[in-house]
Amino acid sequence: MVVFSKVTASLACFSAVVSAAAVPVKSPRQGFSVNQVQKTVTGTRTVNLPGVYANALAKYGATVPANVHAAAVSGSAITTPEENDVEYLTPVKIGESTLNLDFDTGSADLWVFSTELSSAEQSGHDVYDVSSSGKKLTGASWSISYGDGSGASGDVYKDTVTVGGVKATGQAVEAAKKISQQFVQDKSNDGLLGLAFSSINTVSPKPQTTFFDTVKSDLDKPLFAVTLKHGAPGTYDFGYIDKKKFTGSLTYTDVDNSQGFWSFTADSYKVGTGSAGPSIEGIADTGTTLLLLDDGVVSDYYKKVDGAKNNYSAGGYVFPCDADLPDFTVTIGSYDAVVPGKHIKYAPVTTGSSSCFGGIQSNSGIGFSIFGDIFLKSQYVVFDAEGPRLGFAAQA
């Protein structure tokens, strides 16, 4: 069941009530916005750059190259990674608990830190209290694993999940019971809210419905729009398109959701002012930091960067931090989506290093590209379930 309630500033005004079978009562449908936040964490936080890369590959079933795995295990890291856009998070209320979650259009699970973890594992995190309001889904379980060896698993509960001002009751919540230290050490992140298609939800024995699929029929339009920012929190707009957030008009392209992802085909690409390259098939994924492309495209890009090289020990392409990087342009229909070179200068390989890790890396031959945050944070992107389709425009 979905219930709309009155909330604050960034929320469009609305009110609706639906039945237990998630069939809406005839009342006005509206939309709402939620702002990302940058959670303050006490002490120094580090991020393993090759681990970020390895996780992105493993998420889509790619074989993680031995050197990337070795670099991830060795722990090459930077400090204060939020400055380099590793992740911005969105407050979500689950039952009586409010957690900061990573919204991920590349997965379909809502999993969170919970009171089923040990007190040491909960420390520094906001956690979901499974005893406060949730109802355990008997016999259901979930498990995830990533390329750097991290993972989590646990039980499944049904509870009320509130994003902005929309409440989805009876929503599946995957409560962590076991979790790796990599997640425990990331004190800013309390879990993940998947926005891919429900067909790839990993709950066993029966996949569950995503938050968006639960509420979309009660929105003014069955869509959400993403405005990620470079070096700043962004917003997610549910049910409406905010014309103040983009310039020009939206260009739409069809989505192939047969594999459960927001997959699309870009007509061509260009490095700097160079000639156009061939089409690129890929997935729009807010849960992946990097822009992962075919080897030929990656090579084309870094040929234009002085001092760039595929560094075996670093686990990917690196270049001098003072290098000038060309823009990377993807053409979608009549629209040229430009990724500024400064966005591709991702982060120092280690704290104080003069070498930087590139935001464009190889997709390790998986057969499609991943348009992660490096690409998305210069675009206004509409994820429209009606079609389905994606709409693109330059951010205002």
UniProtKB/Swiss-Prot annotation:
CDD domains noted in UniProt: Aspergillopepsin_like (cd06097)
UniProt-annotated location(s): Secreted
Regions that span the bilayer: none
Glycan-bearing residues: 311
Pfam families the record matches: Asp
PROSITE patterns: ASP_PROTEASE, PEPTIDASE_A1
Propeptide: 21-72
Quaternary structure note: Monomer.
PANTHER family per record: ASPERGILLOPEPSIN-1-RELATED, BETA-SITE APP-CLEAVING ENZYME, ISOFORM A-RELATED
Family: Belongs to the peptidase A1 family.
Protein name in UniProt: Penicillopepsin-1
Organism: Penicillium rubens (strain ATCC 28089 / DSM 1075 / NRRL 1951 / Wisconsin 54-1255)
